[in-house]
């Protein structure tokens, strides 16, 4: 018998292909310390990377246990800075507004948006385990009346057309076809609504996807898109960019520090560092208005 958290709503087909089922299986089974140990610090669980200058003095701590704790806190500070940057690009928003978190993971980004604006948030994840976890966290925080998570497909959410003032993807676009994704965002957003994405993409000027990008794809069972495809797909789906920011230099310190965190590494760190340094991979923020 399957028990469903009362805060989770389901649709009949959260996964609509064999590939999507494999992605759901991956995230239902995922227990990486780099996600869980950082989130335990303040119950803000993120599934994205960090930005900003890292305090590398944490590596000088001689006590192994304290060193691990300091590194964990510093990495979490950097990933929280990334979440705050994304949230800052969603506004201005009011407490009456509703926002949509596509590929919400364990829910940290929706909480950050709610804390900043007081708004209603709907997060969607293909992982039933993540939706249950995120709803439980919202209930423990006492914000479950306004912050809710759903076990649904972000390409076919079933949520209200034109009901959202803002929406975003934070490192989840590489699991889907961009035209299908942006069509759903355009449907959900009211006219003038804001869409924000932070994502890794391969650099068209490099040529094709590099070896390192291919390794990242294999590691996460994803398909990283070229930078150019984001802008083409947005144009086809009534999303007009108003701000583009290259976060590649800002995320490199996070990856360099993480690569030295023996208790948190997943084995993909060197591929990220190399790809960012050789120019084949970029980390972008794009904000767009729905017209």
Residue ranges and their predicted role:
Residues 200-221:
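Short, glycine-/aromatic-enriched active-site segment of Class I SAM-dependent methyltransferases
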Residues 55-62, 76-97:
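Conserved alpha-helix/loop element of class I SAM-dependent methyltransferases that forms part
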Residues 155-167:
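A short acidic, Gly/Pro-enriched loop at the edge of an enzyme's catalytic core
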Residues 222-238:
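Short alpha-helix
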Residues 179-194:
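A short glycine-rich, Lys/Arg-flanked "PGG" loop and its adjoining helix->strand segment in the class I
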Residues 98-100, 109-156:
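Class I SAM-dependent methyltransferase SAM/SAH-binding core
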Residues 243-265:
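Conserved catalytic loop of SAM-dependent methyltransferase domains
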Residues 2-48:
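N-terminal auxiliary segments of SAM/dcSAM-dependent transferases
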